[in-house]
């Protein structure tokens, strides 16, 4: 149930193509993989950075969760997701420790990732991710 790594860092953006070009130029990233994320009504682009992913999220709809976040907070850092070996066990441990989470359980992320939003810590939205069912490249 230990944390395994920084799984991914999300940035919320208005224009996905513009953001990809900017992140590639400024950070020297090779390329982004663009993926539809229908359960969040967003389009995402991800690029590998060491053992982690840098993810850009562009809402398709202002009423989606990412759309509401963008409207309230503007573009920029969105969330930090930490990898775990067993998400369901970790959520059960948090519950038994009396720690409330945003999500009642895990939900589907992109590419077979299982995720759960655990709320904000000192202003940063935090999430846990279990990608043990995903292909190792995912």
Model segments located where?
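Vicinal oxygen chelate
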Residues: 2, 45-46, 55, 91-138
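A cross-kingdom feature marking solvent-exposed beta-strand/loop segments within repeated
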Residues: 5-7, 26-41, 60-78, 93-115
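Short coil/turn motifs at helix boundaries and re-entrant loops, enriched in small/polar
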Residues: 8-10, 53, 72-90, 122-125
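N-terminal beta-strand motif that seeds the catalytic metal site of vicinal oxygen chelate
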Residues: 1-21, 77-82, 132-138
